């Protein structure tokens, strides 16, 4: 997976650190899913979820691919539908601090749909995220949670 991610960053002509701040620049004339090995990235992400013994590095790679796949959200959906409660808790714990904002905002949706242990705490943390898009999406999710409980 790491080799594929390195190839992606070279192909997209952006450093992961820059992508974590700006997302996809509109000037390049291509989207993330135009990457020739995009389907392989998605398959690797699914394989990580299917693995029962997640490492911190594997989760970080999974979250990076989820960020890259932020338009179709297929990685996010796969996590929601296929991760065990234990895996989901690991993903969320690491994910709320992950460098890619496009992964963090998707976690808000995963959190309210699956409600892992301590979900309100994680959602609250995302509501106070430094990135405005993450905090906006998390606040929207928080409002949906509050409306369901009233």
Map each language-model feature to its residues:
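Alpha-solenoid helical repeat scaffolds
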Residues: 74, 91, 106, 122, ...
